[in-house]
């Protein structure tokens, strides 16, 4: 019985010592929190450490990218990817690109929570449809521009010819109309020589030589 009593007394003294030391430990923890504002992320736990309920160390990989004022960002990232996977992905990326990587993880996690089936693929397909619609619209606009350019080119060709005609009329020139094309003439058909008919030989008229000869003979005749 004496041994058990001594044991209980030792346990009671130990609990009393821990209870007396607890306020001093809490004071030591709270003192650094009232330090300079430049060490906000090293003293005040970041959103990741606050969610995971752990002390935020100075070399915390989440501290520069997950502010304690926006805890919902790391909450969505932790729910989709997990804290350990996010830490590995941030460590694999160069330090100059870690901020962009963290923002990308936040965006992808939010999209995955809104659309658990497709995730980012739904947003990508919607953007691709918009790109195709804009390309079709751009093609239609380019065809309309080409039509207007062709009309302007035709108009520039017609206007100089009209100005030349107007200048010709103003100068008092006479327009000469070209004669119509001549039709091809048919060659004359050859005429065939017909032999003289007997009637034409019998009833041929006397020539001037026969008349003169008849006058001479009538003068030599003497009717006594």
UniProtKB/Swiss-Prot annotation:
<dbReference type="Pfam" id="PF03195">
    <property type="entry name" value="LOB"/>
</dbReference>
<protein>
    <recommendedName>
        <fullName>LOB domain-containing protein 15</fullName>
    </recommendedName>
</protein>
<feature type="compositionally biased region" description="Pro residues">
    <location>
        <begin position="178"/>
        <end position="198"/>
    </location>
</feature>
<comment type="similarity">
    <text>Belongs to the LOB domain-containing protein family.</text>
</comment>
<dbReference type="GO" id="GO:0005634">
    <property type="term" value="C:nucleus"/>
</dbReference>
<dbReference type="GO" id="GO:0000976">
    <property type="term" value="F:transcription cis-regulatory region binding"/>
</dbReference>
<feature type="domain" description="LOB">
    <location>
        <begin position="44"/>
        <end position="145"/>
    </location>
</feature>
<dbReference type="InterPro" id="IPR004883">
    <property type="entry name" value="LOB"/>
</dbReference>
<dbReference type="GO" id="GO:1905177">
    <property type="term" value="P:tracheary element differentiation"/>
</dbReference>
<dbReference type="GO" id="GO:0010628">
    <property type="term" value="P:positive regulation of gene expression"/>
</dbReference>
<feature type="region of interest" description="Disordered">
    <location>
        <begin position="171"/>
        <end position="224"/>
    </location>
</feature>
């Amino acid at each position: 019985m004496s041994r058990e009593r001594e044991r209980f007394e030792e346990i009671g003294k130990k609990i009393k010592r821990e209870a007396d030391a607890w306020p001093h430990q809490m004071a030591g923890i709270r003192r650094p929190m009232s330090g300079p504002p430049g060490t906000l992320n090293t003293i005040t736990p970041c959103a990741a450490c606050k969610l995971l309920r752990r002390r935020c160390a100075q070399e915390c990989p989440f501290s520069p990218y997950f502010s304690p004022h926006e805890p919902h960002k790391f909450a969505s990232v932790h729910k989709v990817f997990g804290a350990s996977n996010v830490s590995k992905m941030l460590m694999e990326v160069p330090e100059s690109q870690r901020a962009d990587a963290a923002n990308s993880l936040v965006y992808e996690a939010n999209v995955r929570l809104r659309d658990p089936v497709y995730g980012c693929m739904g947003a990508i397909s919607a953007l691709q449809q918009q790109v195709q619609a804009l390309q079709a619209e751009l093609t239609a606009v380019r065809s309309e521009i080409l039509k207007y350019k062709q009309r302007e080119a035709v108009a520039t060709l017609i206007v100089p010819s009209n100005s030349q005609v107007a200048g010709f009329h103003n100068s008092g020139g006479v327009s000469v109309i070209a004669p119509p094309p001549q039709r091809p003439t048919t060659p004359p058909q050859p005429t065939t020589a017909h032999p003289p008919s007997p009637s034409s030989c019998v009833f041929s008229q006397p020539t001037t030589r026969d008349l003169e000869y008849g006058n001479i003979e009538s003068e030599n005749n003497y009717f006594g």
